Amino acid sequence: MPSMAAHNRSALLLTLVVLLPPFGVFSASVEAAETRELILAAYSVPKEAYERHIIPAFQKHWKQKTGQEVRVRSSYGASGAQARAIIGGFDADVAVLSLEGDIDQIVKAGLIAHDWRKAPHGGMISASVVALGVRKGNPKGITGWEDAARPGVEVLYPNPKTSGGAMWDVIAIYGAGLKLAQQPAAGKPAAPEVAEAQAIDLLTRIQRNVRIMDKSGRESVTTFERGVGDVIVTYENELLPRVKNQRPYEIIVPPQTVWIENPAAVVDKYADRHKVTDVAEAFVAFLHGPEAQAAFLELGFRPLDSAAASSPVTKFPQPTQLFTIAELGGWDQISTKLFGAQGLWTKVVEDLAKK
């Protein structure tokens, strides 16, 4: 005859079998309840868009879709510095940077395996133009690049060695010099070598006026807000929200400026290591979607469709001589030409330091 202890054990096992759900249901419940973690590395400029709008909206979206909470650990800094940190071991699952050249460096390091340009708009998630910020009332009478190059005008932009935004700034100045050379008073465009010389001259005269080169675009704006400088060269979207909030300066969009596009990509090696590839891919897809795009637009970015950017609905000024990186040969060519060891901007800075 079974003992009383054996009888009790049998009763307990029967109770557990009745009360516990099937294994598959139980594991699904645990998975739905778990908190996933995503590490985001971004350039400094769009911090407010992410922290105030995009990240909370994505967390809500992911919760509704999967039942899971997602915690986003975000890091913001100069684009080039962020790219180097990722290559050096900062294990970000998603990189949102200022320029495609920084993403390409991560690709070359073997950390991004997929073709990130196959995403909508070639992998770009936001757009802007390089603009000039001036003091309220424009006391220096700045209307364009030549005015920023006048003696006695103090200019700010960050350091291209650390800041992707600064690279855009310098490219805008150089490209503007080429555009200006194509419309001389005589009506005949300058020869290529003459246009190049004029572009270098404009770059030299503006660089001579640069008071401080901060590490990032955001630091440069902070310096300008402290009262340093007459003109800041920066993203238009850095200036628009501040003017809207009654900051004491104005925006000048030069006729000659560059069309800016900013990329985002999953960092495959780290996302796979953390087992969050699904979350990372969903986050990047969310950045291309209407909710994130509306947040970018609200904070001064332009629509990725340049035609829409000039529509009456968005009311962005349309520069008459807007140009793109592609017109200057693409990122690989222009970055080497301007910022390489023997680059034009590099030589300008070195020559000015000797004087």
Feature-to-residue mapping (PLM):
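Ligand-binding pocket segment of bilobal, Venus flytrap-like solute-binding proteins
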Residues: 180-254
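Extracellular/periplasmic juxtamembrane helices and adjacent flexible linkers that interface
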Residues: 271-355
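Boundary at the C-terminal end of the N-terminal hydrophobic targeting segment
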Residues: 27-32
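Periplasmic-binding protein-like
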Residues: 124-129, 200-207, 214, 245-277, ...
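N-terminal secretory signal peptides that target proteins for export/translocation
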Residues: 1-8
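Bacterial N-terminal signal peptides
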Residues: 11-25
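Short beta-strand->loop
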Residues: 41-44, 134-135, 153-195, 206-210
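N-terminal segment of the mature folded domain
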Residues: 33-163, 349, 353-354
